[in-house]
Amino acid sequence: EHTEAWPQGRFNHYWFDLNRDWLLVQHPESQGRLEVFHAWKPNVLTDHHEMQSHRTFFFQPGIPSRNNPLTPARTFELTAQIAEYHAAALDQLGSLYYTKESYDDFYVGKGSTYPDINGTIGILFEQASVRGHLQQNPHGERTFAFAVRNQVATSLSTLAAVRQLRVELLTHQRDFYTTALTEAGDLPVKGYVFGADDDAARLHHFSQLLHTHRIQVHELTRSIEVGGDTFTPGKAWVVPMRQPQQRLVRALFERRTSFTDSVFYDVSTWTMPLAFDLPYAELKGRAWRQDLVGDQIKATVFPQGELEASAHPYAYAFSWKDYYAPRALYRLLDGDTRAYVATAPFVAQTEVG
């Protein structure tokens, strides 16, 4: 019972770790979770886990040198204040614990850090796993009940802290969003533009992800060329920096190449437009004009495909650049359709163009 068979209980039906899906939001569980999170806007969110059996009990703050620089200092100050309540609760039980080691707060795409970049205090708890009913570890015999007790105790200490720090937590969330707007004026980058002339599906899915994170996306009012890429209205959109989610916008779009520490517990880079292979550019200096920002896009519509065919087609061709090209090829092969690869560019004259 101490060694669970792979893929273990950590994963969902698709064998994906949902605690790494807070930014990606590719799974229905995560999509539902973020809908509730943004509707509720909690002041504190606790993230309870288990870790290696030879350890004791961890609660945040994490390793200070690995804090994400986009997370306000006040977030870590409040986390440390709340930690005092956990320490008192575990001292009363005689449980061993530690902080500021092992885990960090750099990657904002997990359950204890996504809240931090959204005006909430996220707190990670890690209990040394018993992996059964009873296990011997360097600290003696540990039972399943003991492990559960520590998690319950720190859940209750969180509630006690929230009650005592109610005003501080409410003020923090208010200030988090107001300072996001004021700080935007001092940033050199005033916004981002992204687009995909040849793939409406990729543009749709990326925009859908931004909407899930409550990031404001606007129409591009006129064609611009930035960094060697041309962006055209209808096929490119703008994300202005001056908005409540300014810090999350920076976290998703910026390319960070300098760090205060050389070690990371988790992901060290996650520039999201690159994951979608989307051309995008910073709007700063002379590239930025307020009149580039058009109406806000409240929702995107999934683009519909269309088969262009003559009366007696000899063959069909489609571009591999499209987001759904691999799926289309799979469906064709699954239906016993014979498919070929073009090994060189070609131009073909058809009845439809």
Segments the model singles out, each with a brief description of its role:
Residues 1:
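Carboxylate/His-rich catalytic cores and anion/metal-binding grooves
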